[in-house]
Amino acid sequence: MKLNNSFFFMSVIFVFLIIIQFSTATYSKSEIEYYKRFGYNLETGEYTRSSPHQHQQQYQQQPQSRQRNRHNSRYGSERRSRQNPYNEDYYSNQNYYQQTSNDLDETAPVYKQGVSIPKNINVGISIDEVTPNVIVETNKPTFSQSLTKPTEKPTLPLKPSIEPTLPTTRKPVEPEPKKTLPPTTQPPETISPKSQTTPAITQHQISTPSPSQQSHHFFYGDGRPAGAGTDDKEEEETKTPTRTHKPINIDDDDDDDETKKPTRLNNNDNNKNNNHRNNNNNKDDDDEDEDEDENKNKNKNKGKPNIDDEDNDEDDDEPEETEEPTITGSIEEAKTPDPNLIEGYSSESDPSGSQSTHEDNLIATQSNSSGKISITFFSFIIFSFTIVFFLI
């Protein structure tokens, strides 16, 4: 009997808990009134009206008076939409567009002919209905003439004025540029620009031109014009040593014979150059002495900046070592990595790793906190069933 009583008692408690959770909750008056604004009744669970903005539709369906300002009637819904920025009726309601079209039609009558006449001005026109035919009184012929003149007169003079001008402008233009005349004038013109344009092209190019046509336009690097009474062999003799001598002197200051000997010259050219140097031995010796003195001074000075550069390199190396570590202390301490930094990244050294681990912990705690409610409920149910099972 005790087992049956305990089972009955536990089952009653379990059913009572379920009824409490799934029973209809009692809502406060503020919540009920809030949902009634949107047309939803919490007690019955039904919608009282179709749209949530009935107060605006009632305002729009009211008949508008003609004395109302046109500006307010046109932009009234826009002003209302500012109060309710999430107003769906502002984009979906058709009454807004109907109001604007009606207001435009009421301001001034627009007729089929495209003539709009205001109501307050008496022009002498009687209009019974909106028809394309306009009845004009005979008392004021000036206005009637103004209506007839622009329709009849402009059409008549335009036709003869346009037609004769077109053939007159077209006919004389065709015979003037005859096809037979241009070929007679063009061949000399085509030959002359070619002769003038080709030297302009060769000035930019380095290739040697023919001395017959373009000698007075082309100039060598020395400033001598091409074809000025000199043969091609003599030009090569003068050009080649200068061009081979310049790039060698840029790197080496020593005036040795081996450096000055051009490699691409004939034997005759070498003999001529050697004879020229033998005649000028005195000048070359003086130049060589000066060059040697300069080279000695340079060599002496070359050693000094090397020492300074080493010192500068040492100075430059020191700030690089100080800039790399962020931890305050000696350089050796900064170079040796800490075991703490290797095993688990700290917040200072690697914020991404620390944040990731911290966020994982937060997520785990949040999931546990959110799951506590469900776990307690299910644990209570399981605990109750286990007790009942063992009691039976």
Swiss-Prot record:
Transmembrane segments: 7-27, 372-392
Protein source organism: Dictyostelium discoideum (Social amoeba)
Localization of this protein: Membrane
Sections of the chain in a coiled coil: none
Acidic residues composition-biased segments: 284-294, 308-324
Biased composition (Low complexity): 49-66, 147-160, 266-281
Protein name in UniProt: Uncharacterized transmembrane protein DDB_G0283675
Topology in the lipid bilayer: Multi-pass membrane protein
